[in-house]
Regions:
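Conserved phosphate-binding catalytic cores of ATP/NTP-utilizing and phosphoryl-transfer enzymes
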Residues: 1-2, 107-128, 304
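Glycine-rich phosphate-binding loop and adjoining helix at the ATP-binding site
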Residues: 71-117
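Glycine-rich beta-strand-to-loop/alpha-helix junction loops that act as flexible
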Residues: 77-80, 97, 133, 259-268
Length: 336
């Protein structure tokens, strides 16, 4: 294998190494997920986990693909946004790899990487992105040389909301997949269920969203004695409908005809179904990459690094500091 970009992802609970060939062919990542024994993600504990598993994961990637300084074109890493201690681990590893192999270093925007891996894997060209993850919920579209944030959460990300609700019920991290399962099982057994029976707040404010209200209301429903599966179904229906409504408004506003799903919550089959129905009604097309490329992964970092290197963009070591508060629209886009 020749001419590859290696990507290092470490923004939150996942440390991941992936690679993409310069011709655009992507390869699965080597990843390790930090799972806290209780509560949510503790940044320093997650960073300790990343430090402990980094050497083994990287060695596995190097050995499988026979990587060396002769076939690596660049090292890309998540420069932000994310949890500071976690970002520092990935940045430190990436700098060491760049220096050791004497290849360019490329600091990339984690949010933009979700867009570019989605574009490359699905073939969509100029989509509206519904970006739904633990720490982020944004509706994004390209405008000139930026990916513009058209709408976003005003409090917590939808993934964090689902994980917090799951934790309140004693469901371990990550809670989203379990909520999806409980919701599906309950709905299958109650096909005529009505949302009015388990109503929750609707969280759209113009083009923005918030999820703390729906979280508190869902817990109140549990305290009132409602079935957990029923509340899981309701919380998904309400939260996803809000996201899809904002995405639909963005499609109408921009005139674009492609909707792309990205982020860990984009793995949810019910959300995909709702996006597909809405897109068909608008005569648009909904896209999403394979689930392994929706969750945080090193391959998406490598893909954005590849596009940047091909555009002659790289990062000097002295400019490679992490930026935990980096926003999607802070990155200038000069590639197609």
């Amino acid at each position: 294998m020749e001419n590859v970009v290696v990507g290092v992802e470490s923004t939150a609970h996942t440390l991941s190494f992936g690679l993409v060939e310069m011709n655009g062919r992507a390869h699965p990542s080597k990843s390790s997920l930090f799972r806290p024994e209780e509560g949510g993600i503790h940044p320093r504990e997650a960073a300790d986990h990343h430090s402990e598993v980094a050497a083994g994961l990287l060695s596995s990637l190097v050995n499988e693909y026979k990587l060396n300084s002769n076939n690596i074109s660049a090292i890309a890493f998540s420069q932000g946004p994310g949890l500071g201690p976690c970002l520092r681990v990935g940045a430190t590893v990436a700098r060491a790899m760049s220096i050791d192999w004497q290849v360019p270093l490329v600091g990339v925007n984690h949010c933009v990487a979700h867009i570019e891996i989605g574009r490359s894997q699905t073939g969509c060209i100029d989509p509206v992105l519904l970006y739904v993850s633990g720490g982020n919920t944004q509706v994004i579209a390209r405008a000139g040389d930026r990916y513009q944030v058209i709408g976003e959460t005003l409090d917590i990300g939808i993934g964090n909301m689902l994980d917090k609700f799951a934790r309140m019920q004693g469901i371990p991290f990550p809670g989203g997949p379990k909520i999806e399962l409980l919701a599906k099982e309950w709905k299958d057994n109650n096909p005529n269920a009505n949302l009015e029976e388990i109503s929750l707040p609707y969280s759209v404010q113009g083009m923005d969203l918030n999820f703390s209200g729906i979280l508190n209301a869902a817990q109140t429903r549990i305290n009132e004695g409602n079935d957990l599966g029923a509340v899981c179904w309701s919380i998904q229906e309400h939260a996803f409908a809000a996201c899809v409504e904002v995405a639909e408004r963005a499609l109408a506003h921009t005139g674009k005809k492609e909707l792309l799903l990205g982020g860990g919550v984009a793995c949810n089959e019910r959300l995909r179904q709702m996006c597909e129905v809405m897109s068909e009604e608008r005569e648009c097309i909904a896209f999403w990459p394979e689930k392994k490329y929706c969750v945080d992964n090193g391959t998406m970092i490598a893909e954005l690094g590849r596009r940047m290197i091909q555009s002659e963009l790289s990062t000097e070591i002295k400019n490679s500091s992490i930026n935990p508060s980096l926003r999607t629209d802070h990155t200038t886009i000069i590639w197609e």
